[in-house]
Amino acid sequence: MKKGNPKKLDTSDMCGAKIAVQTGTVQEEEANTIAKGCEADNKAEVMSYKRQAEAATAVATGKADAFYADSPVAGYAISQTDGQLEALGDVEGVAKQGIAVKKGNTQLAEAVQKAVQKLMDDGTYMKILKHWGVESGALDKAEINPTDLD
C-alpha cells in the first residue's frame, strides 16, 4: 500500500479497497474470495495484472489501494519504490525456497548446500535477503531435500 496508509486499510477488512494482484496466483484467488465476502455496495475490487510489477505500479500511481503478493515479491517491490510503498499486516504462510539441481547430481547438490550454509553462517545470506527486501523468507539452515516444507 502507499506509505503512511492514506486509505486507512486494515487487513481484517479489505472491503471497498482496490486490490492489485498478479493473474494466476494464490493471492488472486484469495482476493476474489475477500471480494465475494463483501456487501454489494462495498465490494473489494480485484485488479488483475499479467506481471507483479504492474500490480505494484498500480498502487504507486494511485490506480489501486494495495497489492497482494508473496512476501519476497512484495518485499522486493517495496524496496524498488524509493519509499512510496510499505507493507500492511503480518507475513503469513512463508514458504521455503530452493535451488534446483539435476536429479542424481549429488556432488553439485552437496557443494551448493555447503556454499549456502557458509553464506548463512557468516551473515552474507541475510545481508543479501535484506538488500532485496525479502528477509521474511529467510531460512536458518541449508538442507538437501528437506522434509519439513511447511
Where are these regions (language model features)?
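Ligand-binding clefts/hinges and TM-proximal coupling segments of bilobed small-molecule sensing domains
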Residues: 26-46, 87, 117-150
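Flexible hinge/capping segments at coil-to-helix
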Residues: 2-19
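Hydrophobic residues within well-ordered alpha-helices
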Residues: 14, 59-60, 99, 112
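A ligand-binding cleft/hinge motif common to bilobed small-molecule-binding domains
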Residues: 32-37, 58-93
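Periplasmic-binding protein-like
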Residues: 2, 79-117, 135-150
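Beta->alpha turn/N-cap motifs
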Residues: 2-3, 22-25, 51-52, 68-75, ...
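Short amphipathic alpha-helical coupling segments at ligand-binding clamshell hinges
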Residues: 13-15, 70, 104-118, 124-128
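Short helix-initiation/N-cap motifs at beta->coil->alpha
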Residues: 6-9, 46-58, 95
